[in-house]
Amino acid sequence: MSKAQTLSAADRAKLEGLIGHDFAEKERLDRALTHASARTEKGGNYERLEFLGDRVLGLCIAELLFRTFGTAGEGELSVRLNQLVSAETCAAVADELNLHLYIRTGADVKKLTGKRMMNVRADVVESLIAAIYLDGGLEVARRFILRYWQGRAVRADGAKRDAKTELQEWSHAKFGVTPIYRVDERSGPDHDPRFKVTVEVAGIKPETGVERSKRAAEQVAATKMLEREGIWQQSPAGN
């Protein structure tokens, strides 16, 4: 495996323009884009940054929702928050930034496709947020987050009801039963776990969801079942 190359000056300038921040410490940006599989001269990768970025993103999105939806209850705010900090949303932001052109990985990771590669793109976005926060402070990080999340926060599908609640009401009405959730698998490191959860409703095919928390994975599984059964309109690909 060859050593990963640092960003060229031209690529760094282009990416900083998309981010809206010129890094005082350029190494922070390089590290935020470096997967653990990549061999670099200094040996750094984005794992620790990802841990911090997840928290910064959650704080800024929670504040955005609190200020934007003044009459929403805790349940609705939680649903919106889970949608906006999900791997799918973070990966969509990564695609908007064309981060796949800049992520440094080993050869084995370059072969990943689908959900696993989506998770890599999502992780890099969180790492990037941490790098911005460390380099420019909370206000700069908040400005970046608002730039790419504010529009998503007010989309119509953000008001969708809690999937688990909706599925429970539907399954009670149709089958007289309560959905059953079980954790099938927990994988990944402690700082970035993945939970695979299956939801079962007696009489129909089960569905599974994979996310960074048990609760979020349950929501994904419930959403998939609601969409499959025609209760909810299926989200367009890429959203």
Curated annotation (Swiss-Prot):
Matching CDD domains: DSRM_RNAse_III_family, RIBOc
Protein name (record): Ribonuclease 3
InterPro entries listed in its UniProt record: dsRBD_dom (IPR014720), RNase_III (IPR011907), RNase_III_dom (IPR000999), RNase_III_sf (IPR036389)
Coiled coil (UniProt feature): none
Subcellular location: Cytoplasm
Major enzyme class: hydrolase
Domain of life: Bacteria
Source organism (scientific name): Rhizobium johnstonii (strain DSM 114642 / LMG 32736 / 3841)
The EC number(s) this enzyme carries: 3.1.26.3
